[in-house]
Amino acid sequence: MPLLKEDRYTLADALTWDKRERIELIDGAPVMMAPPFRLHQEIITALLAQLYNYLEGKKCKVYPAPFAVRLFERADDRPEDVDTMVGPDLSVVCDPGKLDDIGCKGAPDLIIEVLSPSTQCHDRLTKYNLYERAGVPEYWIVSPEERTVQVSTLVDGRYRVQELYTAEAV
């Protein structure tokens, strides 16, 4: 299957792609995601366990990648209409009405991305702006290299860095 064509891609196309490949769609353009490193997976597993335990018995649920988040999908959209689909490392969704068999329709309440060398620019710039535009209320960027967690919250439609935690503070 050729991955590049002149037209924009949609969720309908993505649903036909090899499920073993990590591919995101950003405004109709496919973005190949590199396989994560061991440390990346260890951090995600630790965060997943903490969030799962914290949210137990609450209405919010945490979902690890692969989990298709269609940030701008509306209720009446067909797969052919959806041109943006990301697979955050962790997503917290508090509205069960946003969930379907594929993943999440609309913005999750919290997205966490753990940086890898190959995704650092993508997560800090492209996804930061994308999540802000989609109205994701809270976005955490975890940097294993810097040993930091940047917590940004949406205020008047723009992200503001609320906290920058270091390994010593955690």
Each predicted region: which residue ranges?
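Gly/Pro/Ser/Thr-rich low-complexity, intrinsically disordered segments predominantly at protein N-termini
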Residues: 1-170
